[in-house]
């Protein structure tokens, strides 16, 4: 929208990123582990600020200074040939410094004006502070069972860090069962399987939209949001052939 429907006199600048990382991996016959520290220093990062074009479409704008920093940890354990455990986690801090929020003022459906609200430091939208992935895998001859789980922390849906415009943290698990065998003719390998998604029927949303506005007297802030609710427990079967 910035190029097709935005102001031709105020095209955004290219964003710049300096990424600093330091890590250490370890591996032997039954254990893998690693840690990685990172600091991502943005200049002129393009983000949504609430700015709109002439027809009300959202525009991205450059913010002078923002960053992402954190630590990534991973661990893999295989104590025997039929079991493996893999887990990884990320703790992060994702911030925009001196963020300026643009809030439109409406009279009904008519856009009257836009006011700017300055914030000292805000969380970057859709950037949870904590992520966790876990997987238990069991194999025996041609059988395989794997339980994969993911935890995602609370997320803000705008860069203004408005508590009313958030996605709640959630924890969801999927179970995969499969059997692989080798026919004697034509097909080298066949895998039959079934996957149970959202095994524990968690009610959660993993995406959405959000916006803020004022009514015409500028005394009533309106925070609006929509959420992408995800499916409850559902099952999918699959079959694959290798020739």
Regions found by a protein language model. Name each.
Residues 1, 30-32, 41-47, 93-99, ...:
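Gram-negative outer-membrane beta-barrel proteins
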Residues 11, 21-25, 36, 62, ...:
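Outer-membrane beta-barrel architecture
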Residues 11-62, 67-69, 95:
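Membrane-embedded beta-barrel scaffold of Gram-negative outer-membrane proteins
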Residues 30-33, 82-85, 142-146, 184-190:
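Repeated loop/turn-to-beta-strand initiation elements of outer-membrane beta-barrel proteins
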């Amino acid at each position: 929208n910035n190029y097709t429907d935005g102001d031709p006199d105020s095209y955004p600048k290219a964003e710049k990123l300096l990424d600093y990382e330091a890590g250490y991996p370890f591996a032997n016959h039954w254990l893998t582990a690693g840690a990685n520290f990172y600091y991502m220093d943005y200049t002129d990062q393009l983000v949504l600020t609430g700015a709109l074009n002439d027809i009300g479409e959202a525009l991205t704008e450059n913010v002078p200074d923002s960053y992402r920093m954190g630590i990534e940890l991973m661990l893999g354990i295989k104590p025997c040939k039929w079991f493996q455990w893999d887990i990884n986690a990320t703790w992060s801090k994702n911030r925009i410094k001196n963020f300026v929020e643009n809030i439109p003022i409406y009279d009904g459906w008519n856009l009257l004006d836009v006011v700017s609200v300055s914030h000292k430091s805000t969380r970057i939208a859709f950037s949870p502070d904590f992520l966790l992935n876990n997987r238990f895998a069991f194999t025996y001859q041609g059988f395989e069972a794997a339980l994969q789980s993911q935890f995602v922390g609370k997320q803000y849906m705008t860069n203004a860090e408005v508590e009313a415009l958030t996605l709640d943290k959630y924890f969801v698990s999927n179970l995969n069962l499969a059997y692989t065998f080798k026919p004697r003719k034509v097909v080298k390998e066949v895998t039959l399987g079934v996957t149970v998604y959202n095994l524990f029927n968690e009610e959660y949303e993993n995406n959405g939209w959000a916006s803020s506005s004022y009514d015409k007297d500028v005394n009533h802030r309106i925070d609006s949001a929509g959420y992408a609710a995800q499916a409850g427990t559902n099952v999918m079967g699959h079959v694959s052939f290798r020739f």
